[in-house]
Swiss-Prot record:
The gene is fabA. One of its GO terms (biological process) is unsaturated fatty acid biosynthetic process. Its EC number is 4.2.1.59, 5.3.3.14. It is found in: Cytoplasm. It comes from Xylella fastidiosa (strain M12). PANTHER family: 3-HYDROXYACYL-[ACYL-CARRIER-PROTEIN] DEHYDRATASE, 3-HYDROXYDECANOYL-[ACYL-CARRIER-PROTEIN] DEHYDRATASE. One of its GO terms (molecular function) is (3R)-hydroxyacyl-[acyl-carrier-protein] dehydratase activity. Transmembrane segments: none annotated. This is 3-hydroxydecanoyl-[acyl-carrier-protein] dehydratase. One of its GO terms (cellular component) is cytoplasm.
Amino acid sequence: MSRQHAYSREELLATARGELFSHSNARLPNDPMLMFDRITGIYADGGSHGKGIVNAELDIRPDLWFFGCHFLGDPVMPGCLGLDAMWQLTGFFLTWSGATPGYGRALGCGEVKFTGQVLPNAKLVRYEVEMTKIINRTLVIGQANARMLVDNREIYFAKDLRVGMFNNTESF
């Protein structure tokens, strides 16, 4: 199966509407919760574990919605949004790889470190997600390590991010 290796914002928003992948009902969040503008590379066999990688970018502008409310007079991107982007990308990888139809849900992570912040004068956030394990049974679970860089400086690191793909989320 030939797969695309980069995605535009329009294609990512099509995923939010359930229009991009015919084999799955998994979706990315819609605006404003979609936390990246494009996927610049996604590969099934990359990374130090050979399980796959996905890289994405978010263009930073002073008018992004979160700067107006977090915090008044001290605008900063909430750390949880960067972490959520890492979960979004892990779930996107599972859907892209054809693992299973299902609804993606964040299941946790082993470790998170914040060593910097995203301010309105920044230009670019990059996400680098490296898959470390994929369990494909009744429940598909993806595990990844990820880092977030602002203007080429690493500011977040997450280890053992976990995303599950559920056929039914009512009992979750």
